[in-house]
Amino acid sequence: MNWLTNVVRPKIRNILKRETPENLWIKCPDTGQLVFYKDVESNQFVIPGSNYHMRMSADARLRSIFDNETWYDVALPEVTADPLKFRDERKYVDRIKDARTKTGLHDSVKVGFGKLEGAGVVVAVQDFDFMGGSLGMAAGEAIVRGLELAVEKQCPFIVFAASGGARMQEGVLSLMQLPRTTVAVQMLREAGQPYIVVLTNPTTGGVTASYAMLGDVQIAEPGALIGFAGARVIEQTIREKLPNGFQRAEYLRDHGMVDMVVHRHDLRPTLARLCRLLTKAPEIDAAPEPSPAAEEPAEPMPAPEAAAPSAPPA
């Protein structure tokens, strides 16, 4: 028995560990139930049953919005990686390197240009997995460049906000991005193009004092935490108990801070409809079916790769 217990059984455990992916199961933060990862992924990262909206990566978000899951990555300007030579427990440059390795992103905001139900649109996505989606110089440049591109292309701009606020490691250079992005939003307005904001979980801090609350239409995902300061800080400041659901998407909708709360499965058609209404563009009809007299239908073309060239066409 000692040989079976001490040698064979540990080897079997090691084999099973190697064959089992670490993210095979996901625990729902709302109900605590374990759900198969692939079921959540195929459901746009919404937990089946509880409808809890998990965070989405920037690439997954862009795939869920653009036609045929295809878009052009917008080339973004380079900025100084560590302007203040900041260090706390670790060097800021090391934190940036780790975040880039973890997410595959250059910074917390990714911008894409593509088609949404046949119409051109620029979409910016904040990825919370990159240092909490914090707003620094690179993220601010990405938002501004996306808005400039929307003006150039004369098309709507959609931003998916998910952030813990300004990036403290960049100090006042991070805070400067609040007025810069606000001015860029005004530039888009003067060009007569729609600016649509989708608030996801969580959207807090400095971004709520700038571009995240300036949309022509404010949309929120169900249950998203949205606010400037945390609920505990507010309670300690005003010395009063806050109401249930305070700073959640549904509470903000009921009190006029957002226009609508939209389930993730309904976001794409909702955004397409809003873009058509705000640009007064006609609805694009589906391609007509071939006549019965046609000999053979054309061969279907496979969908292109998700990530296309690095810059949109002129």
UniProtKB/Swiss-Prot annotation:
Provide this UniProt record's keywords sorted from A to Z: ATP-binding, Cytoplasm, Fatty acid biosynthesis, Fatty acid metabolism, Lipid biosynthesis, Lipid metabolism, Nucleotide-binding, Transferase
List the record's Gene Ontology CC terms alphabetically: acetate CoA-transferase complex
> What molecular function terms (GO) are annotated for this protein?
acetyl-CoA carboxylase activity; ATP binding; carboxyl- or carbamoyltransferase activity
Q: Which Pfam families match?
A: Carboxyl_trans (PF01039)
The pathway that the record names for this protein is: Lipid metabolism; malonyl-CoA biosynthesis; malonyl-CoA from acetyl-CoA: step 1/1
Where is this protein found? Cytoplasm
Q: Which InterPro entries match?
A: AcCoA_carboxyl_beta, Acetyl_CoA_COase_Trfase_b_su, ClpP/crotonase-like_dom_sf, COA_CT_N
Q: Quickly give the catalysed reaction.
A: N(6)-carboxybiotinyl-L-lysyl-[protein] + acetyl-CoA = N(6)-biotinyl-L-lysyl-[protein] + malonyl-CoA
Entry's family note: Belongs to the AccD/PCCB family.
Quaternary assembly: Acetyl-CoA carboxylase is a heterohexamer composed of biotin carboxyl carrier protein (AccB), biotin carboxylase (AccC) and two subunits each of ACCase subunit alpha (AccA) and ACCase subunit beta (AccD).
Q: Which HAMAP family match?
A: AcetylCoA_CT_beta
> Which NCBIfam families does the annotation name?
accD
Protein name (Swiss-Prot/TrEMBL): Acetyl-coenzyme A carboxylase carboxyl transferase subunit beta
What species does this protein belong to? Answer: Nitrobacter hamburgensis (strain DSM 10229 / NCIMB 13809 / X14)
